[in-house]
Amino acid sequence: MASTSGALVDDNVLEVLRKAQLDAFISQFVFLFNVRRFDHFSHVRDKDMLEIGMQQVQIRQLREQILKMSREMWNRSDPKQVYIQADQSMPAQNSIDEKALIPNEQIKLYELIGEGSFAVVKRGTWTQSNGTHVNVAVKILRDISPNIMDDLRVEASHLLKLQHPSLIRLYGIVRQPAMMVFELCEGGSLLDRLRDDKKAILLVSRLHDYCMQIAKALQFLESKHCVHRDVAARNILLARDERTVKICDFGLMRALKENEQMYTMAPQKKVPFAWCPPEALRHRKFSHASDVWSYGVTIWEVFTFGEEPWVGCRAIDVLKNIDAGERLEKPKYCSERIYQIMKNCWKFNPAERCKFGAIREDLVAAMFLDAVARETYNSIQPGALQLTKGDEVVVVENTGQDWFGQNKKNQKFGTFPRSVVFAQTNNAVAAATAVTPQKVPTAPTIRIPPSHPPPAPLKPLNNNTKTSLNDRTSKISMPVAGSFIHTGHGDPLGGQSWGNPATIADMYLKNPVNGAPLSSMSSGAEIIASKELLTNGGRSTHQPAAPSPAVMSKIRGLSLDLPEYDDFDRAFDDGFSPSKIELPREFCGNDSVISGGSNSIGLANTYVMEPPKQAFDIRGNRVLPPTNKAPVLIPTNPAPSVISSTASAGITLSTNSSQMFTSQDRHSNMPANLFPELQHRLNQGSSTGNGVRPRPASSIGIQNNDLSMLNPQVNRPFSVVNVPIVQQPANIPCLVPTPAPPAPAHFSQPVSSQRVAQQQQNTLQKALNDELKGNLNKRPTGTTAPPSNGFNAPRADVAPVQQRPISSASIPALQPQPIQHIQKPIQPQQVRIPPSTAPVQKPVQVSAPTHSNVAPTTSSQASADARNPLPPKTSPPVSNTPITVAPVHAAPTTSAPSTSVVTRRPTSTTAQMSDEERRSRIAMDISSALPAPSALLYGSNSTSSLPSAAVSTASSVPSTARDNPVETRPSQPHVTMPPKKSSEPILSSEVLQPTRLPSATTSQAKPVTQPIRHPSPPVATVIPTAVVDKKPVSQNQGSNVPLFNITNSSNGYPQLNGYPNYGNGFQAYGYGMNYHQGYPGYQGYNSYGNGMGQLALTHNAVTSLPPLVPSENRFSGTAQPLGESDIMEFLGTQQRQAGSSSRAVPPASASTSAASGITDLSMADKMEVLYREADFTHKGNCDTMVSQCNGNTEQALKLLKQQHLVDMELAMSTETARQALEARQYDLPAAANMLLG
């Protein structure tokens, strides 16, 4: 059959060539360079154009026209194809050699071995002219149209030139019938082999090799400017030995798809949408980047052993998932690095996808390790891999303690400990799969003068010759950084060799260098934390012996032995703390500071000192008693046990450090293991008695709570020596938190003598006494003071020189200190008080404390008040008159409760406060506003969930406070704490009773107290049972909706992104939450079913929304449900309003039909139906389309669906969209699926 000599070319290709004045070269570009589309210009090189006779000026003009056309492509319609007749004078470049034409009688066909989308494949035999029989695979094309035959001839000419080991070989073609003769791969399809259950499972290492061969073949096609277009596991063939794979169908898909009609409207089974990138599904563009995407899906098939990608999804579903950022999940039997290669192939932007050359490099780096089991591993854990000694394992994942791999003997997968295998790190890819180890600090160079003998040899690591081979090999690890020492050199030519293995110094042979191996812990063997772990089964039993004086007299250098804990994880498990690190101390005459284990003084200038005696601490480190007591810094914030007053609370610094060591020598023989316990007790103190807060001791120059003086021989690593004492002023200008320790009633020693006694007291004895006193204070005696909640107001009315018993109820937790060096007064800070929902009295502001000479109460009186508190009284009715209050600082009689009481009384003047009074006022505001910790954490004694407000009387106000009243503003609340019983347990067993919330459906009105959100007088609101329409009606207001329904409508403003949902809130246009039955009004967002929402609604939509009007329950704190009458009134008003607004100017037909019968839908109802049906677009588009259709909503819906398919680029024109919709009865998803194939 004679074939036509011509081709179909896009018109924009001819336009570019004509604008560049290259009409004479059109035949060469079309038939020689195969430029049929505009994007084919990118494959034409300048070298090729020079070979056909083009000049540099012509090439430059062509490039300019191509660039100009590329900028205009977005505004152009689809190109039209023009038939170009081939030039008969031009040599047939694409003509097939006569040797490639096979006569039909030489082919003998047998059984069917495969069936593809465009052809069937049968096994056959080709009898050559010399009589040789060759087994071949014959592909018989289904379509034999003239255009197909022309494309077949062109593609066959290219396939005959593509010779690669991983590409199927084309022997020739048969003209009649149209057949292509390929080499036969007896292994069959790779997809069938992966799914075959009767054969053994392929090793993952073999699968990795398949991926390497496929990538290499596709890289070869990329270099030849060939696009495969159908890379999949079904198009990969196996050889008989199953070691070689070959790609088939390359070039054929491109030849068939050059004709656009062959791609569109094809059956679903013929379109590999699961392997196609999004640009190929939308724009029918295939390139090398599309082959990269398909290659990623292919290796996903390989490592899932033949699973179907995107199973159960349609073409439109796959496109939606890809646009949403979803990708295929990680296969179970591939490593993380291979899955990363897949994700690199699945980049949404084609320009960001990697090339096949980079893919091959990544695959080499992700090659699997081979390991050998050094012992038998049998585990009953699910998913564990059973191993026998000597089994070979392919390691898939080698991160962590448990590895994942495949046993080569039984092809099973599972996890196993990395310690039971030995990884063959001699593989070239071992370093690539290992994690980069952390940098290990190198030890300083040791220079030993030759005049001195070498150090004493250490004991070898392990001299046990009876250890088995398995035990010895399990201790072998990769080389450690810095462990190779050049002790000899060999020269094959002679003359340059030096050194002998027999004369290597014992210092190098018997002193191991520990550290992280070069291959890191993830791929190497187990790291030995210390040398003792080699012989003690993983647990160190290091007990250093006392060195001899002869060894101590030698020159001291840095030891090669690392500390006992050089593995942080093991040290952390053993309870090791960084504060226990013992840094080495120099044996120099001066106490130099050692930082990081390095010494700034050279070894040549080091002076050796003979120690008087040897001493060792609990860890076995060598310590020496100091020759001279080094001066240290005294803590700048000592905790005095007795505080006299606020006037004399300045902290003084001691300038004589020798007083701290007056009584330490007598306790130097105390066991060192008691230090942590004493440290803990001193830091914590008595939890119920003194309440001393631990101070941070991490700063340099501050002792760790004065514990370092208990044992002067213990080397404290973080103490600084030879540092002069810092001179500080006598008074610290700051607010210092001071402790409030309890004192017994009989303890009345003066303050000055008590401080001296405390400073001279033994630290251990002080700790035991404090604990004893704390235990005594826990007993409910007659002199027990109520525990302080830490928030009481400071006692500013006590004279500084007055001596009285100290109790926790009278000592403030935050005591202001006198400031002498600050000239500018401190401004009072504004304290935000949390809102309260309890019915309390009108909020007031507590005035500043004033000085008064009130006789203090004794501890027995205070305890009696605490045991017998007055019950709180009900708050009187609140009036709108301004109320002032004066605070109460002390109770002169036992009738007043121990808690703070607020009294309302008129005042007329405002007192001028000093700086100290202002600070005291701030402290008292904080203490009075915050409730007791026990009431917050454990619950109060009351059965109500709200704190009761105590009512104060005029008799509880001191006379001094009455004489000097202070005006306050009633804008900030003063919450009084409920009284506490002294014998109340720590954890209260009483159950808190919930507070009943007010409801609008009750038969009678109930007063509801509003929470205080702004500094305004509280208002008691009465909620009526019936809704009374007394709210002002605006111009566009048809009905009022409570704020509860509007605020629960969506996540944004209801006017912009919501529409009514029949009284149940507002449905969201934008991103909203999923619909739930318990939360009506919420509807999930569908990225393809719904639009993104409109920012400006139409007039009809705006008028249908209820306005935002403040309701009565704005500050109620609880949502009031609507009654049945409210809902009916709201719905009726809204429908009337929507109907009146939408029926303003109806069409004549619509108005007639509406008036004729009640059953006909009104225009508003039709619009609502249209809005629901056309939820894929905006309401504004619906209104515009209805206007264009003269009110015909059905026609508007059809046009909207057609326009939506065009906007989604699923249809090339509205006519195509209309045909697809009519074929699917205007079912939009079905029509979109049909357009996608």
Swiss-Prot record:
Compositional bias segments (type: Polar residues): 749-766, 778-791, 847-863
Domain of life: Eukaryota
Cellular component terms per the entry's GO annotation: cytoplasm; plasma membrane
Compositionally biased region (Low complexity): 881-910, 940-961, 1138-1156
GO molecular function: ATP binding; non-membrane spanning protein tyrosine kinase activity; protein tyrosine kinase activity
CDD domains assigned to the protein according to its UniProt record, in alphabetical order: PTKc_Ack_like, SAM_TNK-like, SH3
Domain comment, as recorded: The kinase domain is required for import of dsRNA into cells.
Reactions the enzyme catalyzes: L-tyrosyl-[protein] + ATP = O-phospho-L-tyrosyl-[protein] + ADP + H(+)
Effect of residue 124 to D: In qt32; induces defects in mobile RNA silencing
Enzyme class, broadest EC rank: transferase
Family the entry assigns: Belongs to the protein kinase superfamily. Tyr protein kinase family. SYK/ZAP-70 subfamily.
Encoding gene (name): sid-3
Lineage: Eukaryota, Metazoa, Ecdysozoa, Nematoda, Chromadorea
Organism: Caenorhabditis elegans
Location (main, coarse): cytoplasm
Role: Tyrosine-protein kinase which plays a role in RNA-mediated gene silencing by mediating import of double-stranded RNA (dsRNA) into cells. Not required for import of ingested dsRNA into intestinal cells but involved in subsequent export from intestinal cells to internal tissues.
One GO term of the biological process aspect: regulatory ncRNA-mediated post-transcriptional gene silencing
Domain Protein kinase: residue ranges: 107-369
Tissue: Ubiquitously present in all tissues tested. Expressed in the somatic cells of gut, pharynx, body wall muscle, neurons, skin and excretory canal cells.
UniProt keyword RNA-binding, yes or no: no
Pfam families assigned to the protein according to its UniProt record, in alphabetical order: GTPase_binding, PK_Tyr_Ser-Thr, SAM_TNK, SH3_2
Disruption phenotype: Defective in transport of silencing RNAs but not defective in execution of RNAi. Marginal enhancement of cell-autonomous RNAi. Mildly defective in silencing the intestine-expressed gene, act-5.
Full protein name: Tyrosine-protein kinase sid-3
Record-annotated active site: 230
Region (Disordered) residue spans: 683-704, 741-802, 826-919, 940-986, 999-1018, 1134-1156
